[in-house]
A protein has these predicted regions:
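N-terminal small-domain helix-loop-helix segment of the aminotransferase-like
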Residues: 2-88, 93
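PLP-dependent aminotransferase class I/II
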Residues: 38, 213-290, 294-297
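PLP-dependent aminotransferase-like
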Residues: 97-156
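Active-site pre-lysine segment of PLP-dependent enzymes
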Residues: 120, 137-149, 162-223
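Short beta-strands and strand-loop turn motifs
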Residues: 127-130, 153-160, 186-190, 298-299
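Conserved PLP-binding catalytic core of the aspartate aminotransferase-like
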Residues: 278, 291-325, 343
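PLP-dependent enzyme catalytic core of the Aspartate aminotransferase-like
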Residues: 324-325, 334-365
Length: 365
């Protein structure tokens, strides 16, 4: 008897999402905010969490959190907001909501792996469209794929992961118009917005009619709360009301909600951390640009890509050599053709970044 008899074969054929062991490492692999909660706030948060009624299901504090986020982002009139247990859950709920015979999801690649995984798990056809070699959207290929498949959802990460760039606004506007014409949805994924000079929310407010079929998704992970798992999505109130029907009723724990409310009440602390990260991003990029055999690409996120000169295995060798020096980065060189010879590095603290730069210099010597 097979113990896997009733487990879907396509699920058995998938590869599980893996998290690297970071014990004892300088952790620069997961685009986290590297700064812990300041000591002066730790006691305050502990006191606040100690008062939470953990014996009760989440109640009115979830609505308080939605209101706080709406104020924080400047939610447009006639728009609604829904919460997810991280953006991952929101992506899964979108796939579930659009699961109909023949429905499809489209996204540029390389991109966030959960777009494809969630679509496939819900039985949706997934359509990847490769980026150009310069990491820009291939507009003719996107237009052709959208015309052919009319996907229910088109994901556009702004900035993109792992390439860390913002795509051309004019191209995005034309794609939104094309998808909107047949009633599809464009999801602008702004996970890395705290480190970016741009947000599509400005376009939504400037021209709500042209962006009526746009959903905007963000997370508090990059804000500084990766361990709290809070994602949120903005859209027309009538649309969010429909999507919210499939959200599990208690998907946000009372402790997570309280942590998020606390963080938003001290938003200036996290905004300063984001500014410090952006400053470090510039400094580290400038240092990398001076290293022989290293190409560093522009970034509008809390990460950047470097391309190493050498044979097809150079990125793997450098990745392993850095790991031996207790520096953990992300080897993306085999993820997609356009990422050949590439490593992705999270911007850490000044000390962490200095350790990375010194280790890389030694490895390349």
């Amino acid at each position: 008897m097979s113990y896997l008899k009733h487990i879907r074969q396509d699920l058995q054929d998938m590869q599980a999402y893996t998290v690297q062991n970071a014990t004892g490492m300088v952790k620069l692999d997961a685009m986290e905010n590297p700064f812990p909660l300041p000591e002066q706030l730790q006691a305050l948060l502990g006191e606040q969490l100690g008062k939470v009624a953990v014996n009760r299901y989440p109640g009115s504090r979830i609505e308080d959190l939605k209101h706080a986020i709406a104020q924080h982002v400047g939610l447009p009139a006639a728009y609604g907001l829904m919460l997810g247990n991280g953006s991952d859950e929101l992506i899964s709920l979108l796939s579930m909501a659009c699961q109909m015979p023949g429905a499809s999801v489209l996204a540029p690649e390389p991109g966030f792996v959960m777009y494809a995984m969630s679509a496939k798990l819900q039985g949706l056809h997934y359509i990847p469209v490769p980026l150009r070699d310069d990491f820009e959207l291939d507009e003719p290929a996107m237009v052709d794929a959208i015309r052919t498949h009319q996907p229910a959802i088109v994901y556009l990460a702004y900035p993109n992961n792992p390439t860390a760039n913002l795509w051309d606004v004019a191209v995005i506007k034309r794609l939104i118009a094309q998808v909107s014409a047949y009633g599809g949805w464009v999801v602008m994924d702004e996970a890395y917005q705290p480190f970016s000079p741009e947000t599509w929310l400005h376009e939504i407010k400037r021209d709500p009619h042209a962006n009526a079929q746009v959903l905007l998704m963000r997370t508090l992970s990059k804000f500084g709360l990766a361990g709290v798992r809070i994602g949120y999505m903005l859209g027309r109130a009538n649309v969010i009301a429909q999507l919210d029907k499939i959200r599990p009723p208690y998907n946000i724990s009372v402790l997570n909600a309280e942590c998020a409310l606390f963080a938003l009440s001290h938003a200036q602390v996290f905004e300063q951390q984001a500014a410090d990260i952006c400053h470090e991003r510039v400094r580290v990029s400038q240092q990398l640009a001076t290293m022989a055999g290293v190409t560093v690409f522009p970034s509008q996120a809390n990460m950047f890509l470097i391309r190493l000169q050498g044979d097809e295995n150079v990125a793997t060798r450098v990745f392993e050599a850095l790991r031996q020096k207790h520096i953990l980065v992300k080897n993306v060189s085999k993820m997609h053709r356009v990422l050949h010879h590439c490593l992705r590095i999270t911007v850490g603290t000044s000390s962490e970044n200095d350790q990375f730069l010194a280790a890389l210099q030694e490895v390349l010597a």
